[in-house]
């Protein structure tokens, strides 16, 4: 810095006024940037912010279940692209596939003002694809408000759970006291020698007390399942058709609902070379991940976008296609696999989306990038789909006779449960589709 001061104070002799002006501007700018780069205070601040961000990333990733981490990576991967100044090869060599520029002073101030939970949520939103240019003081305050509301609801839920627990304990204690009182009354009556003829019998008193207990308990009535789209649906009232989306199901998707023998027979006679000549064992394995037509109940619902993310459009085989994916888990044969539910559609002549591809694809955290990469998806997609084949309206779909399954919709997930027709208490297979991460 002293050398720069000398060069500014002692410019070379023989310069014109214009040359001297440019010379001084250049070296003053160099001094300013030098002071910026060599500022110990600045680097200490950057080191502090890096430590905060790294700890937040660690807490986020270690605190998530595998399917939640898949959802985080998938959502962020859909929204992020390589920066213009990096080619894909250079970025891979640099191991710097994606980055965002965020104001370190703003992030540090947010951490000091609101604490670690808000900082963690800010980092989570960056991982979900939030651009650094969109992170300003107003956005930080909005995130802080969301975190506060989330904490308030959590506290209310905890308080409610404690009250319910205390209530259950009080009910149990009251029941125990009544039973003890009843036993004492019975002993007292047995000890009496003469009983009034008009006194109520012991059985009558017990009956009355029993009726009182039933009235106090209130007797909650369990909601019965209702038939929805060929499946037994639990977890809420039946909604009207208003707002539900229109879909048709292509024959190649419906084929997987049949028996393995029938599926093999039809594929062997069909035009798709990838399925011809497959063994019956292979068909049985593929049926497990392809026979998930119950997913359309979710896809047609008003809040389908809360579960499925748009994986892009492309043209192939003479038609424009769209791909959607959702994070899920498949439980079958005592095993649990995490992965994605893939849905491929094209539009028919009336503009109605036709589902020609439906599959659960087991996916590891390391391979999630390929699953959501439009180029990889397009390359692996079926070459040509016979768009003239007969399709079925999704709202009219019913599983073949003998198949028992039900759909269960909850706050953060949607489940399809296949059961043993002979013993419905036995679950043969379960597919869980998870809600997308919250983007602020």
UniProtKB/Swiss-Prot annotation:
Family recorded in the similarity comment: Belongs to the UPF0329 family.
Stated name of the protein: UPF0329 protein ECU06_1680
Membrane-crossing segments per the record: none
Pfam families the record matches: DUF1609, DUF3654
Biased composition annotated in UniProt, kind: Basic residues: 234-244
Region of interest (Disordered), ranges: 150-244
Composition skew (Basic and acidic residues), residue ranges: 150-186
